[in-house]
Amino acid sequence: MVGAFKNLLTDPGEWHPSMDGLDFNRIDGEEAARLEEAFTKEDVFSALSDMNGDKAPGPDGFSLSFWQFSWEFVKVEVMGFFKEFHEHGRFVKSLNSIFLVLIPKKGGAEDLRDFKPISLVGGLYKLLAKVLANRLKKVVGKVVFSTQNTFVEGRQILNAALIANEAIDSMLKRNESGVLCKLDIEKAYDHLN
């Protein structure tokens, strides 16, 4: 079992694409400064309130509903953690410890490929990730190309399918030949590369 997931999650050391010659969009200085501002109680509590508290607890034993329910009691310590992270850019190593659990993708799963690994992460780590994601949401649409249709708020993966459909229809109407390439990305989000 370890070998199967080791192969899945290990970099084979093969060729990697180069980013030379790519022209990236940039954010301005004011937006960059806002990304680096100190965390406020409002930022943290808003992110915490938006999170689903019904998820399984992580290695720390606390679910998000604990942090939501106990906010008034724990906010000083939580904000101390955020202040420390902001000032030093790091946290204790154990904070992002996970429990890896295998969940069957279908009934009667026997082969390891029939299982999906789920990471149970601690609540503070999830909260930090959410606060950082909320900040990035404000600028990500400016730096991610408009042709990227997923993972950016307001854009839909269905737009890519619609554009592909229109391109094929246009080629057929003009009686042009072409090549259609469909990529199987079944494991795209399970890989570290």
Task: Indicate where each model-derived feature is located.
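Conserved short loop/turn motifs at secondary-structure junctions
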Residues: F62-S70, Q148-R155, K182-A188
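A short alpha-helix capping/helix-loop junction motif
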Residues: N96-S97, G141-N149
